[in-house]
Regions:
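N-terminal cationic and glycine-rich segments that engage phosphates or anionic surfaces
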Residues: 1-71, 78-410
Length: 410
């Protein structure tokens, strides 16, 4: 949060914040949300970590299209390390482009409308903005990688999670202020809060829901010992893709808004920005479609029925009533496709409903939008699972170390 209070040199923050409160500035809401409110402060983290996520989406597409990258992705840990390095470079390059674009098309527009006295739009100011934003993105990437490596959970997701959650209290306080002035009805506000609580409960239940496919292992008699014969299961989650499709959908939705919104005097570009604005019906519909699409795509990447079927056959396992090999692959594909359909429809519904409730109650808050709530719930549950697994691992380590100590004392 310290970086949120380090502004970009030469930018008039009061004018930026005043503009973002207008109808024209409202299209920047989703960019401001995923930067943790840093865009309205135009701090060194104004672009957030979204340039890196956009680069990651582009890289995943290139891996499936470019044979050299596809081959590299199959070379194990070393190949993944090189692809990650390419993604980092792409994220920083994209951040530099976005910083330059903002400096020229937005901040420097109309003779420097958003600049402090003594500053003027030109090469020096453009250079300062680009260097500041690239440094901010590089620092966020470094922190995300350190969190992933030494902390608990995915660093990139946790940074986005923190950026959304930190906006909740200001949004609630702002709404309470509107209640006092009579602009928002108290009953509508209580209804909105009740819906948020129910939405959290429903999302958590669906994120945890899974279909358990029974697996039986054949018995093997070696001498006087019997091996195998255990019964277990394959857990397939209703939402196997997790929170990644939602983050990817938000990243894609930001691109046309980011490119069109700064041109305030161009009605065509403003129309494009408004069309993709997730608070409008058109933008909300596109957002739902993107969430459903990325859910299917990422589930296909994460869950490989062929690999699971081969693993079962290798270790003597089988699904009761299903023959090993190709029948098992087809059975798993059928189950996954059905679960993914319902999971994707649920994610689409949850993306849609909060905006409808906001329109009905008159409480507009992008921090409590469907996409924001889904990210918060998904990241929180993923992190909680990792914390539980770490605690379990530590308890086993403690048990084993005590056993070793007792053995030495004998």
């Amino acid at each position: 949060r310290l970086g949120a209070f380090i502004p970009t040199p030469g930018v008039d923050l009061d004018k930026i914040q005043e503009f973002l409160r207008t109808a024209q500035g409202g299209v920047f809401g989703i960019i401001n949300l995923f930067s943790g409110g840093n865009f309205e402060r135009f701090s060194i983290f104004a672009l957030g970590i979204m340039p890196y996520i956009t680069a990651a989406i582009i890289m995943q597409i290139l891996v499936t299209v470019v044979p050299a990258l596809e081959k590299l992705s199959k070379e194990g840990e070393e190949g993944r390390r090189i692809i990650n390095q390419y993604t980092r470079i792409g994220g920083i390059a994209l951040g530099a482009f976005q910083g330059f674009f903002l400096a020229t098309a937005f901040l420097g527009a109309e003779g420097g409308r958003f600049l402090l006295p003594g500053w003027s739009p030109g090469p020096f100011f453009w250079f300062v903005v680009v260097v500041t934003q690239v440094a901010g993105i590089a620092l966020l990437l470094w922190m995300a990688e350190r969190i992933t490596e030494y902390g608990i959970g995915n660093g990139t997701s946790l940074i986005i999670f923190a950026g959304i959650v930190v906006e909740w209290l200001p949004q609630i306080l702002r709404t309470i202020g509107l209640i006092r002035t009579g602009e928002v009805n108290l009953v509508a506000f209580l209804f909105f809060l009740a819906f948020i609580v129910l939405a959290f409960a429903g999302m958590a239940a669906v994120q945890q829901a899974e279909r358990r496919i029974p697996v039986q292992y054949a018995r093997k008699v070696v001498g006087r010992r019997v091996y195998g014969g255990q019964a277990t299961y394959i857990p397939i989650k209703l939402n196997a893709a997790g929170v990644i499709p939602i983050i990817f959908a938000a990243a894609i939705l930001q691109i046309p808004i980011f490119l069109a919104a700064p041109f305030q005097d161009n009605p065509v570009l403003q129309g494009i920005a408004n069309f993709f604005n997730p608070t409008r019906p058109s933008g909300l519909f596109i957002e739902v479609l993107l969430v459903i699409l990325f859910t299917y795509v990422y589930t296909a990447v994460q869950f490989d029925p062929k690999r699971i079927a081969e693993s079962l056959r290798e270790y003597g396992g089988f699904i009761p009533g299903i023959r090993p090999g190709e029948p098992t692959v087809k059975f798993l594909e059928h189950i996954v496709s059905r679960l993914t359909l319902w999971g994707a429809l649920f994610l689409g519904l949850v993306t849609l409903l909060p905006q409808i409730i906001q329109n009905l109650t008159g409480i507009q808050s992008i921090a409590f939008s469907g996409i924001g709530l889904l990210i918060v719930v998904g990241v929180a549950l993923d992190t909680l699972r990792q914390v539980e697994s770490q605690l379990m691992l530590r308890s086993y380590e403690g048990f084993l170390s005590r056993g070793r100590l007792r053995g030495r004392n004998r």
